[in-house]
């Protein structure tokens, strides 16, 4: 059963209802991301390694080597976007979670996680409202070496004032260093399709799948921001956050992702009618494309080159970058060139926000792309909607 208790700040978008035998209807709600301090410096190639690992692609040796570089913060902290998380209440605990449309698990650091692995993290302690699911386990392991696993509980989870009392919460017993070092994130809230949830022997539903019947529309919309916290709208679209109309395209969810096909693309003034098949993934930082497109993009950037020591394309920090656009039906979604300037790697060089998808088999439209768009994830189609941010 879904119980709702709407925050005062959200009353313009939601209607408080009392518990009922069926899921109560609410207009919708919004949750804002929160900026968090940067931790230990991580080379931008770590974002590449993370994405390759997430989709079980081999992490190239040069990417792995560059990603392993650590040390004091030597980059300009405004040269790439801050890290943003969203506050979620799990049981009696408030955690900072990464909302990820590229996965379908809600997993958290917990009191079951060894103290040495949860240091610096807020964590979930199963309390009186928690019910352990006997025999249920979960496990994730990625090609970059990151992994986590543990037990599963049913507990109350609250996002933006809307609660679900029996949400599957994957409590971490083991967490690899790739996750423990990121003290900004206390876990992940997956928003992909429940078909790829990793709980065994019985996969569990995502938070969105559990609450979508209580919303006026089974949708959520994402307005990530460049160098600023973004917002997630659940159950409605906010016309103040986009310009023009929303263009929709069918979703291929056969692999559990929000997959779609762009009809063509442009680099600056040069256009191509070649289509791009990819997924919309808020949990991936970069825009990862086929090598031919990546090469073509950086051919238009003076001084750009693939630097194996950096694990990707770099260019002079003073270089002017062309816009990158994709065509979706009659709509052109444009990523401003400045968004593709991702991170300073020293010696006057910048790591690009467009990089290779390493033969994953599809492109990944990560945050570099999404931060220019208002994107609607509509479960009723399923379909995706795109409009330029206001």
Curated annotation (Swiss-Prot):
GO molecular function annotations of the record: aspartic-type endopeptidase activity
Domain called Peptidase A1: residue spans: 84-387
Keyword Repeat carried by entry: no
Family annotation (PROSITE patterns): ASP_PROTEASE, PEPTIDASE_A1
Pfam families, per the entry: Asp (PF00026)
Keyword Hydrolase tagged: yes
InterPro entries xrefs: Aspartic_peptidase_A1, Aspartic_peptidase_AS, Aspergillopepsin-like_cat_dom, PEPTIDASE_A1, Peptidase_aspartic_dom_sf
Subcellular location(s) per record: Secreted
Proregion positions: 20-67
Catalytic activity entry: Hydrolysis of proteins with broad specificity. Generally favors hydrophobic residues in P1 and P1', but also accepts Lys in P1, which leads to activation of trypsinogen. Does not clot milk
CDD domains assigned to the protein according to its UniProt record, in alphabetical order: Aspergillopepsin_like (cd06097)
EC numbers for this chain: 3.4.23.18
Example GO biological process: proteolysis
Function as written in the Swiss-Prot or TrEMBL entry: Secreted aspartic endopeptidase that allows assimilation of proteinaceous substrates. The scissile peptide bond is attacked by a nucleophilic water molecule activated by two aspartic residues in the active site. Shows a broad primary substrate specificity. Favors hydrophobic residues at the P1 and P1' positions, but also accepts a lysine residue in the P1 position, leading to the activation of trypsinogen and chymotrypsinogen A.
Protein name: Aspergillopepsin-1
Organism listed in the record: Aspergillus oryzae
Taxonomic classification: Eukaryota, Fungi, Dikarya, Ascomycota, Pezizomycotina
